[in-house]
Amino acid sequence: MKVLVVNGPNLNMLGKRDKNIYGNFSHEDLVKMIEDWGRKNDVEVEVFQSNHEGEILDRLHRLDFDGLVINPGAFTHYSYAIRDALEIVKVPKVEVHISNIHRREEFRRRSVTAEVCDGQISGLGVYGYLLALEYIKKKLEELT
């Protein structure tokens, strides 16, 4: 069982961004937390981060994973290309946001990508990733 975790633009700057919104975790801390979860749950996890839409598309198009957790970052609000790629990906998938996008600026409240995911977790900090991973693990176990 392999789960791909995709982090979009500016998520590499965690720990340097507004800590009131994004917390104190660095991207490296987040990757370690996800990898630790994978080891404890006997799930292969790969964390991929890019600030470039095309690189994210290319990674999704490889289709070499059984489940997907994605934080599209700002692409959430306008990337129809990522939305279409997510629609192509026929695996359990969850959109995650560290902050509660529904309590932020108006332009951040709309997600064009969530409607092609199984669900969206927003506002639970980095722990939203763990909840998404748990869901995907359970969903994949049900399918086998």
From Swiss-Prot:
Alphabetized GO MF terms: 3-dehydroquinate dehydratase activity
InterPro entries in alphabetical order: DHquinase_II (IPR001874), DHquinase_II_CS (IPR018509), DHquinase_II_sf (IPR036441)
Site feature (Transition state stabilizer) residues: 17
Annotated binding of substrate, by residue: 71, 77, 84, 98-99, 108
GO aspect biological process, one term: quinate catabolic process
EC number: 4.2.1.10
Entry keywords, A to Z: Amino-acid biosynthesis, Aromatic amino acid biosynthesis, Lyase
The reaction(s) this protein catalyses: 3-dehydroquinate = 3-dehydroshikimate + H2O
Coiled-coil regions listed in the entry: none
SUPFAM superfamilies the record matches: Type II 3-dehydroquinate dehydratase
Catalytic residues (positions): 22, 97
Pathway(s) it belongs to: Metabolic intermediate biosynthesis; chorismate biosynthesis; chorismate from D-erythrose 4-phosphate and phosphoenolpyruvate: step 3/7
Subunit comment: Homododecamer.
PANTHER family found in the cross-reference section: CATABOLIC 3-DEHYDROQUINASE
Family to which this protein belongs: Belongs to the type-II 3-dehydroquinase family.
Function: Catalyzes a trans-dehydration via an enolate intermediate.
Protein name (database record): 3-dehydroquinate dehydratase
Source taxonomy: Bacteria, Thermotogati, Thermotogota, Thermotogae, Thermotogales
Gene field: aroQ
